[in-house]
Amino acid sequence: FYKNQYLYALTYNQGNAGTTRSYIMDSNNEVKARSGEFAVKRFTTYGIYDKYIMTSSTGDGPTAYADENGYLPKMFLLSYLDVSAETFTTNDTQNKAYMSENFLGNGEYVTLAGILERNNKLYSAAIPMGLSQYGSATDGGKWILPGNEDLVKTEDGGSNSSSYKKGELQWTQYPNKCWVAIFDDETLTNKKIIETDKISYACGRFKSQYYQTIWAADNGDIYVFSPSYAKTMADKRQQTTLDAGVVRIKAGTEEFDPDYYYSIEAQTGGKSFIRCWHITGDYFLLLMYDRPLTETGFTANQLAIYKGETGKLTYVTGLPSADLISGFGNTPYVENGYAYMAVTTTEGYPSIYKIDPVGAVATKGVSIEATQISGVGKLQPQN
């Protein structure tokens, strides 16, 4: 949803471009498709900046930038949907400003997670992805940390979002750091990068999607959440030792607050989360896993409220039993300080729950005769 005006069906088509179109509510309160259809590039994250719905992923750059081995550098691949003009544009990867290689100064390429507009700037978590073929081969392998030589792939393999090529060092060598990129505007061509060693990289992960976990409170403070997903890495050298936790960028600054850090796991018996959203004030809604990421079979079937100023996490009461919940909506709808979340269970029809963040209490609302509800939002009639 773009505000209360437009509903966009962002289609993700197994890594390829998918057809995207938008909808409005007319003066007769009927939802109507708009005329434009767009083939949006594959994307791993998305968000709203100014008049645009933006999508981003990282992929191969142009052949003009290939190295002596023919390896292509990784570049940011951006799409811009101008919601009012109903136009679609993409970035020019001939511009080296979109180079994702060595983005953090450690040789690794990154992908972006989340698009947050604050004070006309664009904040995004920069997620280190390891060394591409291009990065691994640079200057005879200077970016490969001593003792990590055996992490470089000796053949092609993997599948889907975990596929890799011979010569890559897949996944980051720096799991105990978090970076945030602060861009001047939606072009992403001018940036400042800040880092902290209090948390691991800031995003939730599911297949090829990198979920936004960087959000602003109403007072302008920006909270950066890390689920510590690197705990799931197979090799100990690439596993984070840091708890899922939260750091902050105070309003009016572009640095991490040195006096702010809270552990999520210390309040949950070691359990983490996959997604989070801002509700109101400094209250945030977290979609929690049922067990630590160091165990197998974890699933996200609980909700919790995090209060930024105190760092306190409180599980939401009033929801169906966690063992009956089979899914939640992709994103909540927020209005007048409450969050409205779709909840699907194995018994009965899915329902919308109203969540009071102050009391961390959910109240059941309308049920829908359907198998599941992927989301909930609100459209105002447009002339």
Language-model region placement:
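Repeated scaffold domains used in trafficking and secretory/extracellular systems
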Residues: 1-2, 37-51, 100-115, 201-214, ...
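Short beta-strand elements that form the blades of beta-propeller/WD-repeat-like
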Residues: 3-14, 50-70, 115, 120-132, ...
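Beta-propeller blade signature
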Residues: 20-26, 70-87, 138-189, 237-254, ...
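Beta-propeller fold detector
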Residues: 29-40, 83-105, 155-156, 190-199, ...
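Aromatic- and glycine-enriched pocket-lining scaffold segments that form the walls
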Residues: 99-207, 215
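Beta-propeller domains
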Residues: 174-181, 186-256, 262-263, 269-272
